[in-house]
Amino acid sequence: MHSTGYCQAVEKAGGIEVPRRARYIRTIILELERIQSHLLWLGIAAHIIGFDTVLMQAWRIREPVMWLCEKITGNRKLYGINVVGGVRRDIPKAMHPELMGVLGRIERETKAVLDAVVTDTTLLARLANVGVLPNKDAIAYSLLGPTARGSGVAIDIRVDHPYAAYGEVETNVMVETSEDIWARTVVRIKETLDSIRIIRDCLAMMPEGPIQAKITEPIPPGRIGQSSVEAPRGETHHYVITGEDNRPYRWKARAPTFQNLQGVPIMVLGETIADVPIALGSIDPCFSCTERLETVDVRSGEVKVYTKADLFRLCKERWSKR
């Protein structure tokens, strides 16, 4: 997700046209990432509420997806598939039947999970009417991804501002309106199934041609490029200013967790302590994406923002004085 966002920002800054085939391959990898991420989340969420049977089943279904990622890119994670101007590796037609077979198996098993989720009384008791995030608050706090869509907000960068091959391949925005953890769960499972369909469509519609643009000149300094990508957790935005020697002068990324955390206090208000972990977990937080902390001195009113590096430095300094 992040490499796509970064590359697209640089490509916009440099006026680089990515070949259509490369855009289709990017879309396939992005949707494989969405599938494995949602299944990973489903297992962790089930573990949080003590339902380890779902954890084991979700991660069992996820494993062939990881195998597909490795088959295509050479890596289970940190795929390294994107380069500025295209992709590093192709998906030849000879690989298509194998991919389609694995996708069919994943689809059947994910449908079984969806059927279980919507009817299982234990899951409904723990997830329905828990961690409620009203639609108006999801809009007011500009929440993103499944967190927003579970509260009835039809927002999805793939549809609102298409990139890669999403302007050519049908993409459905999965929305639920019960505004609770159950809704966020159903949104993710339905998105998993739609991602499988998107990959199939990409394989069927993939055009012939090169997978990398011919870039013959350095990108001039002072150019600005921005790009948004619909990550599994929601919109990820990248901002790039080009510098000298074909290097970035400034690069800023905003991950969706930073925005979605704003909704957690509303979700947990009035809930039991036992429901706080799953309410927080329902946004699929990535705390390494939000490594900053704001503190307010209650005596002076002074406000300070600390990064992860600042906090580690202060921690080491304190212990070195003991």
Predicted feature descriptions by range:
Residues M1-R322:
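Active-site bordering "gate/hinge" segments
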